[in-house]
Amino acid sequence: MAELSFSMDINSIIPKGLNDENLTLDMIKAGQKVMQSSIKSAASRHRKTGSMANSVKCSKPVINRNGDAVGRVKFYGKDKNGMQNWYKAIWIEYGTKHQNAQPFVRPAIKGSESGIKSAMEQVFNEKVKWYKLI
């Protein structure tokens, strides 16, 4: 449902010798946690059983074919009645012909952008600091 990805020339910002794709994946993972928390919080307002809010999970960050670091935050699983949680989230987010849209994912992502950036910067700075100690 929500995807966090970015593309950059990693050699232009990372000091020589620190060219580590795990750094990028760790940065994505930190951003995912912030996004997950924000979406989970927003989803909890639409609580009947709590299964949708509890189903917000992060996928493992990967480097795709284009060389971009990608991490996803999605709704996994089903509720007690067998309804897919991602399906319920789409109904709430965009509405149906009988129910008005009540966006919660997009505002949660938009509201967490600065937190995501800070978390990613913190991971980067810690890694650079560690590298300078070696």
Give the positions of each predicted feature.
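Short, Lys/Arg-rich flexible segments
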Residues: 1-72, 76, 89-134
